[in-house]
Design a protein with these regions (language model features):
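N-terminal secretory signal peptides that target proteins for export/translocation
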Residues: 1-9
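Short hydrophobic/aromatic segments of transmembrane alpha-helices and their interfaces
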Residues: 11-14, 70
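Bacterial N-terminal signal peptides
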Residues: 14-28
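Gly/Pro-rich, tryptophan- and cysteine-flecked surface segments typical
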Residues: 25-300
Length: 300
């Protein structure tokens, strides 16, 4: 029987979300290939150079804090230009350790399983005309590849970029589950609603990526429904979170709050910014929830 799952990965462990339970496993790390493709209307080219994060985030116009590829997973990026000029840019993928995430990048056909692999690369140059849309799939070379996780960014000029990343899990050619998250800006603070209930198999998770070229320290303040602080988490894995690195966890892994209503506030160092996404697993179904880029004044 197949699993409906999404992988939340830290440097040491990978949390596999299944329909019935949460199980821990350590995935293999593979270098994944990439397909060569061009388009007359909007050429797509690949960069085979490493793409390190930058201290200047002004050129970063979209951030996706969670990307899953392999083990049945494909991540599809939908990028839209709602501006009045053409958009020139580059999609860059980075793994959880801050290294270039080599995958197969292509514009997907109707059946994601039919996309052939190509030469390995961690980035793709993009040109989107005004009002245009581009779909780009990130996938492994074959169905037997282990799952890898990381994050992605788009650096661009011109136009106005919007987008979403959709994770889809395919087993034996059949789509089993799908979930999407919107592109977001880097933030200094993020508040996430929490409504955990282990009886209902409902858990709140988060993924954080450091898009800068310097360390960032992040603490998590847990508030109850009345807004009172009940716990402050200073996790070694987040203090610091190194340049280009990413981590994904469920709150109850670190606070043991299996049945809890309230919120968690992620606070980065003053002047530092991170990319954050939040997801809720309930009864084996995954959905994205809002990340609010603000906090109550008393939360520090």
């Amino acid at each position: 029987m197949g699993e409906n799952r999404l992988l939340f990965r830290s440097p040491a462990i990978c949390l596999t979300v299944t329909a019935a339970l949460l199980s821990l496993q350590i995935p293999g790390i593979l270098a994944l290939p990439l397909e060569e493709e061009t388009s007359a209307a909007a050429p797509l080219t690949r960069s085979l150079q490493a793409s390190p994060p930058s201290n200047n985030l002004d050129s970063v116009t979209a951030l996706f804090a969670q990307v899953a590829v392999g083990g049945g997973y494909t991540t599809i990026f939908a990028l839209l230009n709602t501006g009045d000029t053409d958009l020139n840019g580059r999609l860059v993928l980075t793994d959880a350790e801050g290294n270039p995430m080599k995958v197969a990048l292509s514009s997907p056909p109707a059946d994601p399983g039919d996309i052939p692999p190509g030469a390995p690369a961690d980035s793709m140059n993009i040109l989107i005309p005004r009002g245009g849309t581009r779909f780009i799939a990130a996938e492994p070379p074959g169905a037997l590849s282990d799952t890898r996780t990381g994050w992605a960014r788009v650096e661009s000029t011109g136009g106005r970029l919007g987008g979403a990343a959709t994770f889809q899990f395919v087993e034996a050619g059949e789509l089993k589950t799908i979930a999407g998250v919107l592109a977001a800006d880097a933030v200094e603070v993020a508040t996430i609603p929490v409504n955990n209930d282990d009886i209902q198999n409902r858990y709140t998770g988060y993924a954080i990526a450091n898009p800068s070229a310097t360390d960032v320290n992040i603490k998590i303040v847990v508030l109850d429904e009345s807004g009172s602080t009940v716990e402050t988490l200073i996790l070694p894995s987040l203090n610091p979170l190194g340049p280009g690195k990413q981590i994904a966890r469920f709150l109850h892994q670190d606070s043991q709050r299996l049945k809890f209503k309230g919120s968690m506030v992620l606070l980065a160092d003053t002047g530092k910014r991170v990319s954050v996404v939040a997801l809720v697993l309930e009864q084996g179904l995954l959905t994205a929830i809002p990340v609010i880029p603000a906090k109550a004044p008393h939360v520090n």
